[in-house]
């Protein structure tokens, strides 16, 4: 699973996920992409589950790029622990997703195969997505 090798700070503030993606919002590497139209968080497990679904469907053909990385630590306290005593320890990592962000890209397969692979991947994700193709002259 994806996670940072080392962080400057182990814990982060919660923050607010606002605005739209101004970077990483075009098909840059492959011919087809899965773009987020919703807002939310994707955990490292969800990113990996979607990647596996796509990889299984396209079998040996094509190439997949993961355009997001879970770099935000989410902390939680153990069960049945009273409030106070500081912030909990990091449990897992998430990627904050804004609308318009390109999540995955694919190349070397037909459009029908890519569309079906992305449909299977989208079923594993908690946010709304749309299939996009590379624009000519982009």
UniProtKB/Swiss-Prot annotation:
Please give the subunit comment from the record.
Part of the 50S ribosomal subunit.
What name is this protein filed under?
A: Large ribosomal subunit protein uL16
Q: What Gene3D superfamilies does this protein map onto?
A: Ribosomal protein L10e/L16
- Which cysteines form disulfides? none
- Write out the ranges of the annotated region (Disordered): 1-21
Keyword Ribosomal protein in record: yes
List, as start-end ranges, the regions of compositional bias called Basic residues: 7-16
Gene Ontology MF term list: rRNA binding; structural constituent of ribosome; tRNA binding
Q: In which family does this protein belong, per the annotation? A: Belongs to the universal ribosomal protein uL16 family.
Tell me the function of this protein.
Answer: Binds 23S rRNA and is also seen to make contacts with the A and possibly P site tRNAs.
Q: Which PROSITE patterns match?
A: RIBOSOMAL_L16_1
Q: Which HAMAP family match?
A: Ribosomal_uL16
| Record bears the keyword Chloroplast | no
According to its UniProt entry, one GO biological process term is: translation
Pfam families the record matches: Ribosomal_L16 (PF00252)
- A GO CC term attached to the entry: cytosolic large ribosomal subunit
Alphabetic keyword roster = Ribonucleoprotein, Ribosomal protein, RNA-binding, rRNA-binding, tRNA-binding
